[in-house]
Amino acid sequence: MAKKIDNKALSCSFCCKNQNEVKKLIAGFSGFICDECIELCIHLIEEERKSNLAISNYSKLPPKKIYEAINAHVVGQQQAAKILAVAVYIQCIRFEHRELADLVAKSNVLLIGPTGCGKTLIAQTLAKIINVPFAMADATSLTEAGYVGEDVENIILRLLQAADFNVERAQKGIIYIDEIDKIARKSENPSITRDVSGEGVQQALLKIMEGTIALVPPQGGRKHPQQDFIQIDTTNMLFICGGAFTGIEKIIEARTSQSTIGFEATVKSKHDQDYNQILNNLEADDLTKFGLIPEFLGRLPVIATLSDLNQQSLVDILTKPKNALVKQYQKLFELDGAELIFEEEALIAIAQKALAKKTGARGLRAILECVLLDTMFELSNLKNMQVIITADIVKNNLKPIIKPKLQKKSVKKKVTA
């Protein structure tokens, strides 16, 4: 503990607080430091240690562990989870053995699947598993440089913001670009007219996806032209692109079907093959015909197709993941002393509604909100009550059944001396 010198109050050399304003003041050779500054330094060192530990330790996760972690949150996409687990493991190896970075190329991923099948959730889950910064962008808002819209460099800015402007961490992050199918060029053949939101964006993304030193404006692209740029190397960033690619199944069917005429022709029904079976025959040429340029596809060596969710998959999504929707609502009711019960038939009815609306898993929450809205409004008055949801309530928009909770009988234990 520092003492007064010549009856003058001593102060911290860092925060300038005097010894009367802090609990302890420790003297050094030529200065003083207070207990508050020491705690702050310890906190900063610990945060830095955790950051470095996260970057170095995630490489030890084998593909099987990554696969299991994805399946704990994402339902019905086992094949896609396996493909992504291997791709991320390769990234981890590149980080652990830097000398292999030039020898082993990174595995950027293209996710193809219908809306609401879990593309975005898989990318978010991956970032959490390996504890790296994550940023998401919408391809529809991107335009070629010099036109009204968002520059591709702004995607990297979002990742930098997610990493608290720690460039080292940002350079090892994951970027997910959604709606990538919306930047397909308008025709299969190159056009004379400029396609600034289609092929132009694909061309702009080529360099940052392959790996380059990008100049990122810390305050956003065009509103602050005089700002200093931050240099970020995108070589080790993992890019995951996702899209529904509506209509690509027709391109695949046109390629795979052998058209014959006459009495020996095989007549196929449109329902002979479902969406998932058709996507299993996907080839790079099909994506080129859809509108992705070959150079852009070359930067996405790993292609994973996600299955269309059926009724059972949607029921599983409601109940099985760690953060399942039913578990979330049951916890909210529990906090107010109420009990929420879903009958099995009610869960099936919710899944059927989502299938009818063709919104996939994304539509489940909206349906639950509609079913539980009035009950949630009165939740604070439902202490010690049971709220039961049946199939009839879901189908006909009826009010939930509310009745007193069953009291558990307490069993008295005989105490022997």
UniProtKB/Swiss-Prot annotation:
Please give the SUPFAM superfamilies that the UniProt record associates with this protein. Glucocorticoid receptor-like (DNA-binding domain) (SSF57716), P-loop containing nucleoside triphosphate hydrolases (SSF52540)
**One GO cellular component term noted in the UniProt record for this chain:** HslUV protease complex
Give all residue intervals belonging to the ClpX-type ZB domain: 1-53
Instruction: Tell me which Gene Ontology terms the entry assigns under biological process.
Output: cell division; proteolysis involved in protein catabolic process
Q: What keywords appear on the UniProt entry?
A: ATP-binding, Chaperone, Metal-binding, Nucleotide-binding, Zinc
The protein's matches in Gene3D superfamilies, at most eight in alphabetical order, are given as:
1.10.8.60, ClpX chaperone, C4-type zinc finger domain, P-loop containing nucleotide triphosphate hydrolases
| InterPro entries (UniProt xref) | AAA+_ATPase (IPR003593), ATP-dep_Clp_protease_ClpX (IPR050052), ATPase_AAA_core (IPR003959), Clp_ATPase_C (IPR019489), Clp_protease_ATP-bd_su_ClpX (IPR004487), ClpX_bact (IPR046425), P-loop_NTPase (IPR027417), Znf_CppX_C4 (IPR010603)
- Which residues does the annotation say bind Zn(2+)? C12, C15, C34, C37
Give the source's domain of life in one word.
Bacteria
Give the residues the record marks as binding ATP.
Answer: P114, T115, G116, C117, G118, K119, T120, L121
Q: Which GO terms describe its molecular function?
A: ATP binding; ATP hydrolysis activity; ATP-dependent protein folding chaperone; protein dimerization activity; unfolded protein binding; zinc ion binding
Family of this protein:
Belongs to the ClpX chaperone family.
The record describes its quaternary structure and partners as:
Component of the ClpX-ClpP complex. Forms a hexameric ring that, in the presence of ATP, binds to fourteen ClpP subunits assembled into a disk-like structure with a central cavity, resembling the structure of eukaryotic proteasomes.
| Role played | ATP-dependent specificity component of the Clp protease. It directs the protease to specific substrates. Can perform chaperone functions in the absence of ClpP.
Query: Under what name is this protein listed?
Result: ATP-dependent Clp protease ATP-binding subunit ClpX
Where is the organism placed in the taxonomic lineage, from the top?
A: Bacteria, Pseudomonadati, Pseudomonadota, Alphaproteobacteria, Rickettsiales
